[in-house]
Amino acid sequence: MGKRPLVRRRGRGGMQFRAATTGKIARAKYPAFELGEQREGTVIDLVHERGRDAPLAKIRFEDGIVSYVPAVLGTRVGSSMNFGLKSEIRDGNVISVQNIPDGTTVCNVEKHYGDGGAIVKSAGGNATVFSHGEGGVVLKLPSGRFSTLNPKNRAMVGTLAGGGVSERPFMSAGGKWRRFRSKGRKYPIVRGVAQAAYVHPHGGGRHQHVGQSSTVSRNAPPGAKVGSIAARKTGRAKIKDRR
């Protein structure tokens, strides 16, 4: 009897496929302040959280509330961060996007008002306030796409710290395995043709070959839904002759 493919087991969401909660500190979200409320906090520590590349800034407010938010470039212990509509346009301050001028770089942007920051949270990431209009505020995301947001949504001015982490090479396979494990991702990934026939539909045989069409239907059963799923085209791309 065959075994379920790894992709099917992972889709079920067992404990061995989930991101570890050990080493997690707190949710990196903005505090739930009122829209017109003006608050100031002080950075009391910069901490590293497992599975997160950008450092977290531990902020303490006047009333004793402690919150964690992703740190921007230039953040240091003892620096102040302002939350509110009347805050200065300065790196680290959290302001509604309606009050941020065009061309300003922002990060940790709320996708929906009050969610505490949901997009542009990766290390070294930043978005650009593109324009203001009746339909909302348009942001240019790191991917190059444009997104229209509610003018009340909050964003942090500046660029997130830790941008050079992707340039650091992995000196060993074990280091890469630990990094992927902290994020709940699979490494290394074994090709289907290199596996046995009872483990993967592409496995088995005297030599490594798929042995059948690698394109499968979108509605294929879970045990057979491996390979190129609902591919529009396969093979090498044709280069058009521009002569």
From Swiss-Prot:
Q: One GO cellular component from the entry? A: cytosolic large ribosomal subunit
Query: What are the coiled-coil residue ranges?
Result: none
Any Gene Ontology biological process: cytoplasmic translation
Example of a GO MF term: rRNA binding
Keywords recorded for this protein, A-Z: Ribonucleoprotein, Ribosomal protein, RNA-binding, rRNA-binding
Q: Residue ranges under compositional bias (Basic residues)? A: 233-243
Q: Which SUPFAM superfamilies match?
A: Nucleic acid-binding proteins, Translation proteins SH3-like domain
Instruction: State the disulfide connectivity.
Output: none
Q: Does the keyword Ribosomal protein apply?
A: yes
Q: Does the keyword RNA-binding apply?
A: yes
Report any Pfam family annotated for this entry. Ribosomal_L2_C
Give the span(s) annotated as Disordered: 202-243
Family to which this protein belongs:
Belongs to the universal ribosomal protein uL2 family.
HAMAP family membership: Ribosomal_uL2_A
Protein function: One of the primary rRNA binding proteins. Required for association of the 30S and 50S subunits to form the 70S ribosome, for tRNA binding and peptide bond formation. It has been suggested to have peptidyltransferase activity; this is somewhat controversial. Makes several contacts with the 16S rRNA in the 70S ribosome.
Q: How is this protein organized at the quaternary level?
A: Part of the 50S ribosomal subunit. Forms a bridge to the 30S subunit in the 70S ribosome.
Name by which UniProt lists this protein: Large ribosomal subunit protein uL2
The organism encoding this protein is Cenarchaeum symbiosum (strain A)
